[in-house]
């Protein structure tokens, strides 16, 4: 039986930043701790933006609220946010992770149920979102991240530069 994913870890593509990460590994523990604290506040800001978008989601708002309650920041050198997991339960017993992908990307309109099965006409998730690149656009997590991305990048570079300048000055 195939495994199903029940969470998303959102972090930047680090393929272009391998040299930077190696330099960050050379810093002492105090400088790394300072960087992780700065980046954690950025991750918390990002998680708060995603969570607010979930609570404001107009289509299937109860599902989105269950998923939004699971958004949490991670303490790392790069901005990282976790969404989903086993917490939160819907009335049918599904946890937030099981609702995550259907609520974010939608579902096919011919899948599961009939017009008499559910109050909403037989559909468990909103209509599938349009294609974009290798996947779908999403309803609230990925559009929110896309809008926040320039500010996240700017704040992360500022935090890294500030910590590296302090480390270079005092080491």
Regions picked out by a protein language model, each given a short descriptive name:
Residues 28-31, 50-54:
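Alpha-helix capping/termination and helix-coil
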Residues 2-38:
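Long, hydrophobic N-terminal alpha-helical segment
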Residues 2-14, 53-171:
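Charged, low-complexity interaction tracts
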Residues 35-50, 152:
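Non-globular disordered terminal and juxtamembrane segments underlying protein topogenesis/assembly
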């Amino acid at each position: 039986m195939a495994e199903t994913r029940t969470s998303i870890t959102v972090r930047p593509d680090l393929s272009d930043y391998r040299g930077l990460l190696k330099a960050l590994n050379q810093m002492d523990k105090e400088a790394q701790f300072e960087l992780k604290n700065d980046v954690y506040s950025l991750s918390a800001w990002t998680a708060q933006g995603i969570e607010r978008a979930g609570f404001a989601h107009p289509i299937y708002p109860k599902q989105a609220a269950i998923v939004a309650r699971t958004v949490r920041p991670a303490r790392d050198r790069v901005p990282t946010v976790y969404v989903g997991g086993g917490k939160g339960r819907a009335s049918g017993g599904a946890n937030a992770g099981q609702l995550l992908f259907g609520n974010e990307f939608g579902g096919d309109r011919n899948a599961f149920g009939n017009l008499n099965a559910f109050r909403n006409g037989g559909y468990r998730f909103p209509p599938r979102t349009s294609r974009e690149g290798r996947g779908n656009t999403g309803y609230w997590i990925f559009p929110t991240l896309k809008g926040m991305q320039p500010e996240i990048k700017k704040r992360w570079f500022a935090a890294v530069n500030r910590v590296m300048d302090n480390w270079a000055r005092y080491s």
